Amino acid sequence: YPSKPEAPGEDASPEELNRYYASLRHYLNLVTRQRY
């Protein structure tokens, strides 16, 4: 089962935030695909 991506800190750069949201979206896709 995929692990949830770690949230970047308060001082994260925009690149880190974009990478986090992209990985989070990928993680949610994996989780919901396995559920149905």
Swiss-Prot record:
This protein's record includes keyword Phosphoprotein: yes
Feature type site, description Cleavage: P2, S3
Residues modified as Tyrosine amide: Y36
Keyword Phosphoprotein set for record: yes
GO CC, alphabetical: extracellular space
Protein name: Peptide YY
Domain of life: Eukaryota
Family of this protein: Belongs to the NPY family.
Locations listed in the record: Secreted
Species this chain originates from: Oryctolagus cuniculus
Post-translational modification: The peptide YY form is cleaved at Pro-2 by the prolyl endopeptidase FAP (seprase) activity (in vitro) to generate peptide YY(3-36).
One record GO biological process: feeding behavior
Ranges in coiled-coil conformation: none
